[in-house]
Amino acid sequence: MNPGFDLSRRNPQEDFELIQRIGSGTYGDVYKARNVNTGELAAIKVIKLEPGEDFAVVQQEIIMMKDCKHANIVAYFGSYLRRDKLWICMEFCGGGSLQDIYHVTGPLSELQIAYVSRETLQGLYYLHSKGKMHRDIKGANILLTDNGHVKLADFGVSAQITATIAKRKSFIGTPYWMAPEVAAVERKGGYNQLCDLWAVGITAIELAELQPPMFDLHPMRALFLMTKSNFQPPKLKDKLKWSNSFHHFVKMALTKNPKKRPTAEKLLQHPFVTQPLTRSLAIELLDKVNNPDHSTYHDFDDDDPEPLVAVPHRIPSTSRNVREEKTRSEINFGQVKFDPPLRKETEPHHELDLQLEYGQGHQSNYFLGGNKSLLKSVEEELHQRGHVAHLEDDEGDDDDSKHSTLKAKVPPPLPPKPKSISIPQDTHSSEDSNQGTIKRCPSSGSPAKPSHVPPRPPPPRLPPQKPAVLGNGVSSFQLNGERDGSVHQQQSEQRGTNLSRKEKKDVPKPISNGLPPTPKVHMGACFSKVFNGCPLKIHCATSWINPDTRDQYLIFGAEEGIYTLNLNELHETSMEQLFPRRCTWLYVMNNCLLSVSGKASQLYSHNLPGLFDYARQMQKLPVAIPAHKLPDRILPRKFAVSAKIPETKWCQKCCVVRNPYTGHKYLCGALQTSIVLLEWVEPMQKFMLIKHIEFPMPCPLRMFEMLVVPEQEYPLVCVGVSRGRDFNQVVRFETVNPNSTSSWFTESDTPQTNVTHVTQLERDTILVCLDCCIKIVNLQGRLKSSRKLSSELTFDFQIESIVCLQDSVLAFWKHGMQGRSFRSNEVTQEISDNTRIFRLLGSDRVVVLESRPTDNPTANSNLYILAGHENSY
């Protein structure tokens, strides 16, 4: 590159030949390349620039970077700006990052950590002596060469660029390594290069424990914890495994007060890094990467072994005998038509939310804020979430000794035992709001923990828009008695108006490749058989659309594991095993599959594209290899596509909800003696823990649902329904309030009713299924009635499960199903067949039904889906 240019405009491919892609991230892709003139290898980061991103400041960083030449710093070769892509050329480090390495090898040894820490400190000492900060020390940014040399990467120009790019998607991932003074910069008034020394201590823990402290917590909550005055620096968890010297080194690096924290020069004199440490330690580590010993490191729990009985990896659908007659129900399935399923306001609208929350409109105002630093983005996020005002107040927050490093505080005094607790009413509601009836269940003596994340400010009201229509002209305005409208409908309409003509042309018409949709008619769907003779004992079902192929898959959770069925290949129908452990619950969020799996009934998070790729790889293995025993045993962490969510063992029930007021999505799990609440973090594409509430669960736990209420950050958790006691109150919701900082004690003096289903259709509309009756009530448990909506629907059978359609409720019982109109309580559809036993397997996106013969309930089952609606998924 011509040294006269700070940012070359020539074609970089004239100087470098791209060999292979070696990494990718939210910023772009990293390639291994070769200089065509010298033959020298290089690492090239290719970043696609978005409109409005200003990189004028980067040129100044490039000039500064030219002077940075040190054995422990990745050499900078130059940068190219070509069309809308920025190419950053750096020294190639063939050993990879320490994060990549420990994902394969497991924890580093103490001497290896000492060697890496010493080399890192030497690089920081050089940077600090030149008046520079790294600002992003962590395992992912410490690289090894093929010869075992340690190099610091992603600082200077890369740090500035990454900080700018990261505001789009990944700005939230860094707080785990962030020093307290950086987290509280607005109150503390700035920070200096000593923040890098804090990150060295956190990285040492990361290399020893495979993740930084608080990594299982929501990033914003971890950031908030660090700003508290009683925050205690983290320590190594295992006191006996590591030497006193290592413990003391971590303690010195993690000195909370930056004025007392040692400099890089001072820390280089610590006995932990002055002991004899040679490059052979890193070479041994690289050898372990290239020849991993899977017997010494694996990512599984001994209490969750492989299935004892080998089950088929591939299950073909059996062919029906030509002379075999269809059952009476199957004949009716082809004749009875159903209207589309109702999209609830509290249902996480995955694809829509992804574009709305992180689309261009949002980026231009927030993520693409010029050349602001990563820190500034985090500050803005704190402002947006209402945390800043709370940063100045260190009192009144309960302790979270299990997850954080705060000193224990005395919990606040318990309030007097209330008879019932009022729910804030919408100002537009015409209901009497004097008597609140959502009731908090008795909780344990300890307060709900933790509530360190302060409540977000109430969101602004949505502008008036056309109410969303529910079925035959029953709008949400009519259903609610208030002008709330359907958030899903409003957002989709708004999204549609914002699309340019070009974008509309580019959008493919078919949402998925599967069963063909029917024309847009009032009732155009029917149940279609998709599998004949299924031997699995299925507990649940959902569906997913592959973003690359657009093929639609059914995903089943069964005793035998997680299986999938491609609806685009029904001509050669077969189920494929995705995961070998028992599964009792499934939910898909974007490309992430959540499940309750394994012997210990623990929550898992699976990467769906990775899970499908891995299943295909297993099919190519020799038949002699027991593939069902492979996943957790031999798969390195780096490539693991299934991960257990910590602290979620013995999960009985789960539910997912979206808060229509804020757009945030929550996953709640009922454990044996507690409740866990997790929030979806879009940049990280996973649910992360925000609350762990000790609570004695009812036994048996018949129902477990979340209810979103106005002006509350987190949804209430409904664990039961009892008879109403107040005037006009037909039901009373027994709830646990995650927003409370103390325990609420209320005595349940009325027995629970036999409730089979509770679902929140809209903000103040809840459907409660009791025995043979369905009641539509508000948050206070009072019936909602109008000229266009029946408040009660009655059936002549014991309801086992329901699906809400746009005009009706479809109730399932042992030998069939019946639909009744929301308006008139009249029967809209009915299928009955005493020769078959029916069971609803799932209704998220796709309604999936199972059928077995009555005279042989253990026989193989037939599977059906409600198909035919345009845009159904």
From Swiss-Prot:
Domain annotation Protein kinase: ranges: 16-273
The protein's Enzyme Commission number: 2.7.11.1
Cofactor list: Mg(2+)
Biased composition (Polar residues): 487-499
Active site, UniProt feature: 136
N-acetylmethionine: modified positions: 1
Domain CNH: start-end pairs: 535-846
Catalytic activity: L-seryl-[protein] + ATP = O-phospho-L-seryl-[protein] + ADP + H(+); L-threonyl-[protein] + ATP = O-phospho-L-threonyl-[protein] + ADP + H(+)
Coiled-coil region(s): none
Region (Disordered): 389-518
Biased composition (Pro residues): 452-466
CC terms in the record's Gene Ontology section: cytoplasm
Recorded family membership: Belongs to the protein kinase superfamily. STE Ser/Thr protein kinase family. STE20 subfamily.
PANTHER family in the record: MITOGEN-ACTIVATED PROTEIN KINASE KINASE KINASE KINASE 3, STERILE20-LIKE KINASE, ISOFORM B-RELATED
Protein known as: Mitogen-activated protein kinase kinase kinase kinase 3
Annotated source species: Rattus norvegicus
